[in-house]
A protein has these predicted regions:
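Glycine-rich, N-terminal phosphate-binding loop of Rossmann-like dinucleotide-binding domains
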Residues: 2-4, 29, 79
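Short, flexible, solvent-exposed loop/turn segments with mixed acidic/basic and small polar residues
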Residues: 64-69, 165-166
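Internal alpha-helical scaffold of NAD(P)-dependent oxidoreductase catalytic cores
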Residues: 69-154
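Interdomain hinge/lid region at the active-site interface
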Residues: 139-205
């Protein structure tokens, strides 16, 4: 299953009658809790191994595919409690054959980790782009003068809005908690700047 996370979960019911007991069903979505809950609800736990290749770009669609995209990238697997160990081993071997690096995680742990290292950076990038758009000078000097650093940190802001809307909704509880802690860190940085705290500012960078 390789679609925005809402659609991946919705397709499960359509696939249930089409797969046999030997089948391995997987996905490549960035949120795991929601699809695992649907797998459990449908009684498909003996077939499902969640998957998430930690690779990609801001571009979406098969026309932007790359043959070597996941080489040397971590590939997270989130097997259900009831899937056979033989299936997990077989899928790990398949991932390894693609020259990716399989890592097994609990699906709840996956969503906390990706919420911090993937979902939060996308939110930061998008809000920064929107902030510059909303506060730019009348003649657009901010946009015109934005150089390498700004472009590096905001490149991912051009990712699929449908995909990221659904990720934020499906992993919302974790993302909200993580954002709260990040806002605290930004507040501390502001306080250090206001206080002209040279030592703290040096340590931050």
């Amino acid at each position: 299953l390789c679609a925005p996370v809402n659609y991946n979960a919705a397709y499960l019911s359509q696939l249930k009658s089409l797969i046999d007991s030997d089948c391995i069903l997987t996905d490549v979505g960035s949120v795991k809790t929601s699809i695992h809950k649907e797998v459990i609800r449908l009684g498909m736990e003996e077939s499902f191994i969640g998957g998430h290749p930690m690779a990609g770009s801001e571009k979406s669609g098969f026309m932007n595919s790359k043959a070597h995209l996941i080489e040397n990238a971590y590939y997270i697997l989130t097997p259900t409690a009831k899937v056979a160990k033989e299936k997990v081993s077989a899928y790990k071997e398949f991932v390894t054959s693609l020259k990716a690096l399989p890592v097994i995680l609990d699906y709840n742990e996956h969503d906390i980790i990706t919420g911090t290292i993937s979902h939060l950076p996308h939110i930061i990038a998008s809000t920064l782009v929107n902030f510059v758009h909303d506060t730019d000078t009348a003649d657009g000097l901010m946009k015109a003068l934005a150089a390498g650093g700004f472009k590096d940190i905001t490149r991912i802001a051009s990712s699929s809005p449908v995909m990221w809307q659904q990720i934020c909704l499906k992993n919302g509880e974790n993302i909200s908690h993580i954002l709260g802690h990040y806002i605290e860190a930004l507040t501390q940085a502001k306080e250090q700047i206001d206080a002209e705290n040279e030592t703290a500012l040096y340590s931050m960078f």
